[in-house]
From Swiss-Prot:
Keywords: DNA condensation, DNA-binding. It comes from the Bacteria. Histone-like DNA-binding protein which is capable of wrapping DNA to stabilize it, and thus to prevent its denaturation under extreme environmental conditions. The keyword DNA-binding applies. Belongs to the bacterial histone-like protein family. One of its GO terms (molecular function) is DNA binding. PANTHER family: DNA-BINDING PROTEIN HU (PTHR33175), INTEGRATION HOST FACTOR SUBUNIT ALPHA (PTHR33175:SF2). This is Probable DNA-binding protein HU. InterPro entries: Hist_DNA-bd, IHF-like_DNA-bd_dom_sf.
Amino acid sequence: MATMTKKKLISTISQDHKIHPNHVRTVIQNFLDKMTDALVKGDRLEFRDFGVLQVVERKPKVGRNPKNAAVPIHIPARRAVKFTPGKRMKRLIETPNKHS
């Protein structure tokens, strides 16, 4: 299984659309910055057919150290990003050889 990095994404989009990689890099970085800014503010990001990104509050909990299970570890409350895939993405992942 391969990893799609930002560098590979820029290269692929640049080649597919015959756009200079620097222009693609600028647009992608701006897109990522805007997404990050929105999530930091607590906004929900919805991309139809792709999915939803939103910030959720994780409650504090007690964990265990695997090396010493007798000693509890207190994990504080925190904010985290949750991704929920859209219907189309779910369908494509469930049946990877069939594209629609």
